[in-house]
Amino acid sequence: MTASSPSLSPTLELACELIRRPSVTPVDADCQALMMRRLEAAGFALEPMRIEEVDNFWARRGGDGPVLCFAGHTDVVPTGPVQAWQHQPFDALIDEQGMLCGRGAADMKGSLASMIVAVERFVADHPGHKGAIAFLITSDEEGPAHHGTKAVVERLAARGERLDWCIVGEPSSTSLVGDVVKNGRRGSLGARLTIRGVQGHVAYPHLAKNPIHLAAPALAELAAEHWDDGNAFFPPTSFQISNLNSGTGATNVIPGELSALFNFRFSTESTVEGLQKRVEAILDKHGLDWHVEWALSGLPFLTEPGELLDAVAASIKAVTGRETRPSTSGGTSDGRFIATMGTQVVELGPVNATIHQVNERVLASDLELLTEIYYQTLVRLLA
């Protein structure tokens, strides 16, 4: 079954149209143009925002009152080896098992289609709805994420735009659609550490300073450190060394320098400044000649039980019969940028079992359920 099949539902028809556009990050491949045409027909005011090489748009419908925003990305990761796919990655096929196959099916063109169709139905049923509905869409989520949601949020905040609630369409579900929603994410703090020694001949170690030997006890202490206990919403902060590099490639040369890359995934129990000071204190304790460059990817955020989480949970229960489980596990998402506006943020999307993999796929019927969950959430908040 393909995108041209007359038996496809509106959600699946749109999902297939989006998947068939090869929008490998940061290319949008006119996915946003397709979405904007649909939203304009539903009464939305459109504001394209091309920033550097990245396509973004902001769309809004409604007046004063609370604003519910749907956020997501049209870009996808590269396919990997095309010959390893059972079907061409941008053909958007529904197979014999009822799976919608294609790059972006789960992450996250299926969610985008469900959002659009749910909103179209809602504004048709409730043309005089309360508050406003908005869309914040980017083509720079899978890449550096410098000129996408982060940049749009900065512009919206600068002009005082209101954003009360936001549903991000990231694939949050693990086994069944709606079984897990993300109501927060840990912060991500990375660093490049350089330890300086003195290069020399291995036969004359007294004339050199081996940075590997010098750094090893400090790195071991950092790896063993207990950073915090976490809390009811977040696991304890984790520290991981991801890269170590030193040496000339020769067995008879003591290197002059060691570089290490490491990352914190940190909870709301720790701060950026606190983690940095503790790392630097350990390095000083070991008497190292060190330099560190820090890179903050995002602060932790948390949406506690309230209007948005309650509405989403009630909608999932009504549509699927199951209780959802809020979670803050996993990596970062664009929700971290939106949360800086004081917005309640929840990530809700399809099952994430095959995201970024060869043969990415999602159960087609799950997108119908997701559309209904989005629709019922709109009803609970804005009808």
UniProtKB/Swiss-Prot annotation:
Residues the entry annotates as binding Zn(2+) 2: D107, E142, H356
Self-association and partners: Homodimer.
A Pfam cross-reference name: M20_dimer
Function of the protein: Catalyzes the hydrolysis of N-succinyl-L,L-diaminopimelic acid (SDAP), forming succinate and LL-2,6-diaminopimelate (DAP), an intermediate involved in the bacterial biosynthesis of lysine and meso-diaminopimelic acid, an essential component of bacterial cell walls.
Binding site for Zn(2+) 1: H73, D107, E170
Keywords: Amino-acid biosynthesis, Cobalt, Diaminopimelate biosynthesis, Hydrolase, Lysine biosynthesis, Metal-binding, Zinc
EC number: 3.5.1.18
InterPro entries given in the database record: ArgE/DapE_CS, Bact_exopeptidase_dim_dom, DapE_proteobac, Peptidase_M20, Peptidase_M20_dimer, Peptidase_M20A
Stated family: Belongs to the peptidase M20A family. DapE subfamily.
Catalytic activity field: N-succinyl-(2S,6S)-2,6-diaminopimelate + H2O = (2S,6S)-2,6-diaminopimelate + succinate
Cofactor binding, note field: Binds 2 Zn(2+) or Co(2+) ions per subunit.
GO molecular function per UniProt: acetylornithine deacetylase activity; cobalt ion binding; succinyl-diaminopimelate desuccinylase activity; zinc ion binding
Enzyme class: hydrolase
Organism: Pseudomonas paraeruginosa (strain DSM 24068 / PA7) (Pseudomonas aeruginosa (strain PA7))
Pathway per the UniProt entry: Amino-acid biosynthesis; L-lysine biosynthesis via DAP pathway; LL-2,6-diaminopimelate from (S)-tetrahydrodipicolinate (succinylase route): step 3/3
Protein name: Succinyl-diaminopimelate desuccinylase
Cofactor(s) recorded in Swiss-Prot or TrEMBL: Zn(2+); Co(2+)
Positions of the catalytic residues: D75, E141 (proton acceptor)
Biological processes per GO annotation: diaminopimelate biosynthetic process; L-arginine biosynthetic process; lysine biosynthetic process via diaminopimelate
